[in-house]
Regions:
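C-terminal accessory domains/tails appended to large, multi-domain proteins
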Residues: 124-313
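Active-site loops and adjacent core secondary-structure elements that bind or stabilize anionic groups
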Residues: 1-7, 11-174, 179, 183-184, ...
Length: 313
């Protein structure tokens, strides 16, 4: 078991497929099959023949064949999910810990330093953003967090969430399942597990959103307070951050191992951070100059060429 660091909350959560299915964002499932978001609306259609026929008819004649293909894909996916419904194969691990920012780094529980990259061009917010801006500065310097003049809510200014989720191989897998079909569906379950776990953390464990009442569509549209950037996201592009996450979470607790380049196995795994600041938002780091690359490599204690490889994953 991982060491329980002081002033932190560590949890391992296990879910059945049945519990996680409602949180699946079908848009990304169909995207993996090369289909536009409008075809994902089949997931919202009543299962009666009349409603399904009306859905097909809502498309142009040129697109109705593709709509039927989408319906078939969805039906096959639902059948597999029913087969796996009672299997507890969706697992998550999370840590809520005291944190403070120091420059473009976040120090977790005073012992693990996580360096981040900063935008070098002003974004939509009017700032050059870095994820460390959403955590209170050690000396309460004039950073983005202090400029917002927002009082801490349940210590959201000095707390960071770290998480990982994974989906293990279903026992009731049919030999006829295509590898790509299994891969895309378990990928969606891993993301859905992260969605469900994040909701529980906001409402019950971190507790800063106890009264949150959002529909599934609102959850998928990220209408909640806070963000959950995953490793590999545009604001967190360095895959080697997984090694620091492993140091904090001990990913093997839920069956995840890391390759030498920081990739997770099983492939249907998600890892990242949770920020609760009311003004936290997603952004893209974009291009960085050689000066920041050199500084970041120094803070990550790696060679520049090595960092370039992690950023190119």
């Amino acid at each position: 078991m991982p060491q329980r660091i002081h002033n932190s909350e560590f949890r391992i959560l296990h879910y059945s497929v049945r519990e996680v299915v409602p949180y699946i964002n079908w848009i990304y499932y169909f995207h993996a099959w090369g289909m536009e978001p409008r075809f994902a609306t089949i997931a919202d259609v009543h299962n009666c023949p009349s409603c399904r026929a009306s859905w097909i008819a809502s498309f142009s004649l040129e697109e109705q064949a593709k709509a039927r293909e989408a319906m078939k894909l969805y039906d096959e996916a639902i059948e597999l999910l029913r087969l796996w419904a009672d299997e507890t194969i969706c697992h998550g691990v999370s840590l809520l810990a005291y944190a403070y920012s120091e420059g473009d780094d976040i120090i977790v529980d005073g012992r693990v330093r996580i360096p981040f990259l900063r935008q070098q061009h002003v974004g939509k917010s009017g700032y050059t953003m870095c994820l460390s801006d959403f955590i209170k500065n050690k000396n309460d310097n004039d950073n983005f967090s202090s400029q917002l003049n927002s009082p801490p809510i349940n210590d959201i200014a000095n707390t960071i969430g770290i998480f990982a989720t994974t989906v293990l191989q279903p026992k009731n897998s049919q030999s006829s399942i295509f590898d790509f079909q299994l891969s895309t569906l378990t990928d969606r379950l891993a993301e859905a597990t992260a969605e469900k776990m994040h909701e529980e953390i906001r409402k019950h464990y971190w507790g800063y959103a106890k009264d949150e009442q959002l529909t599934m569509s609102e959850l998928h549209a990220e209408k909640f307070q806070g963000i959950r950037p995953a490793v590999g996201y545009p604001s967190l592009p360095d895959q080697s951050i997984n090694f620091l996450i492993d140091e904090l979470l001990h990913l093997s607790e839920i069956g995840i191992t890391l390759s030498e380049n920081g990739a997770m196995n099983p492939h249907c795994s998600v890892s990242g951070l949770m920020f609760a600041h009311p003004k936290a938002h997603y952004f893209s780091i974009g291009e960085i100059g050689d000066d920041q690359l050199k500084d970041y490599a120094h803070r990550r204690k790696m060679e520049i060429e090595q960092i370039k490889k992690f950023l190119a994953q």
